[in-house]
Curated annotation (Swiss-Prot):
Domain of life of the organism encoding this protein: Eukaryota
Species the sequence originates in: Prionodon pardicolor (Spotted linsang)
Residue sites binding heme b b566 per the record: 97, 196
GO MF annotation: an example: metal ion binding
Protein name, UniProt field: Cytochrome b
Entry keyword annotation includes Repressor: no
Keyword Transport: yes
Residue sites binding a ubiquinone per the record: 201
Underlying gene: MT-CYB
Family to which this protein belongs: Belongs to the cytochrome b family.
A cellular component term, taken from the record's GO annotations: mitochondrial inner membrane
Length: 379
């Protein structure tokens, strides 16, 4: 009799994806982030579900309903802060995952990479809409500023913004629809993640050396299930340290003030994980130009496979490209810092320089370094 996990129509899919999956024997801890992202998504859906049981998406009661969750619901404060800080952990894992893909040349799996970019946009949209729901000052003004960017689109811009708002300003209709979208999007993300995995398993995983590993594959279970559990323990430890000791460290104090359309906060800024893109947006004095730069800062990932000039897949044996990669990481950290600073000298010029460096590294310097390294191979 054949094993049920290999014959049952449903269980054999799980078996092929998580148990008997042939995996390269040399993948490092940088390959942990895919499973961690899956766990983050499940955690966010579960905590979000419990929050939705007590939340009301009405401008009059949204803020007080969140307060009610924190004060009156059993462990409501913990569920709320796990959800808020879980989003931060989600983005840390996302950035690491994308960075790993760039470093080791995983973008040569085109379908997997492109679905990954769609996933990134979907997660960013979900996080943005989630930030609006508590209806604090930063929620309201963040929603106003970011949705207003669409008015830069020629001809249809203003109509589009009012259509999204459901009126002439961010109001009850906006909050209700944002809640609806924030609830449905994680399930769409889960479906996209399954497709992401489907395409990945068509080709098999990449590995640090960048060369084919078909000759040296090992089963996913028990080797990588154990390795992933170690990563999971680290993730939960960091998350619970944040939740239990400094739950508001990554948040904005202004969001504890109820939304007031008549009073603008001194510095409107998004959550920390959007600051790099926000800095790029602010560094261009033109509204439409800024919006284009903002979108391109993420969409640029889609053309990375076209800019690959090296004969080698990853950067493991390419010191010049490694230097550029870590320069890019430093540049993104600089942009993140600048995004949280007020719009004044010297922050404006630093932001503009960092934005130029960001696009220059990806579009110009990395392809050139690939060509130089190809020539060095001939020596």
């Amino acid at each position: 009799m054949t094993n049920i996990r290999k014959s049952h129509p449903l269980i054999k899919i799980i078996n092929g994806s998580f148990i008997d999956l042939p995996t390269p024997s040399n993948i490092s801890a940088w390959w942990n982030f895919g499973s961690l992202l899956g766990i983050c998504l499940i955690l966010q859906i579960l905590t979000g579900l419990f929050l939705a049981m007590h939340y009301t998406s009405d401008t009059a009661t949204a803020f007080s309903s969140v307060t009610h969750i924190c004060r009156d619901v059993n462990y409501g404060w913990m569920i709320r802060y796990m959800h808020a800080n879980g989003a931060s952990m989600f983005f840390i894992c996302l950035f690491m995952h994308v960075g790993r893909g760039m470093y080791y040349g995983s973008y040569t799996f085109l379908e997997t990479w492109n679905i990954g970019i769609i996933l990134l946009f979907a997660v960013m949209a979900t996080a943005f809409m989630g930030y609006v729901l508590p209806w604090g000052q930063m929620s309201f003004w963040g929603a106003t500023v970011i949705t207003n960017l669409l008015s830069a689109i020629p001809y249809i811009g203003t109509s589009l913004v009012e259509w999204i708002w459901g009126g002439f300003s961010v109001d009850k209709a906006t909050l209700t629809r944002f809640f609806a979208f924030h609830f449905i999007l994680p399930f769409i993300i889960a479906a996209l993640a399954a497709v992401h995995l489907l395409f990945l398993h068509e080709t098999g995983s990449n590995n640090p050396s960048g060369i084919t590993s078909d000759l040296d594959k090992i089963p996913f279970h028990p080797y990588y299930t154990i390795k992933d559990i170690l990563g999971l323990l680290f993730l939960i430890q960091v998350l619970m340290l944040l939740v239990l000791f400094s739950p508001d460290m990554l948040g904005d104090p202004d969001n504890y003030i109820p939304a007031n359309p008549l009073n603008t906060p001194p510095h409107i800024k998004p959550e920390w994980y959007f600051l790099f893109a926000y800095a790029i947006l602010r560094s261009i004095p033109n509204k439409l130009g800024g919006v284009l730069a903002l979108v391109l800062s993420i969409l640029i990932l889609a053309i990375i496979p076209l800019l690959h000039t090296s004969k080698q897949r990853g950067m493991m044996f390419r010191p010049l490209s490694q230097c550029l990669f870590w320069l890019l990481v430093a540049d993104l950290l600089t942009l993140t810092w600048i995004g949280g600073q007020p719009v004044e000298y010297p922050f404006i010029i630093i932001g503009q320089l960092a934005s130029v460096i960001y696009f220059s590294i990806i579009l110009i310097l990395m392809p050139i370094s690939g060509i130089i390294e190809n020539h060095l191979l001939k020596w």
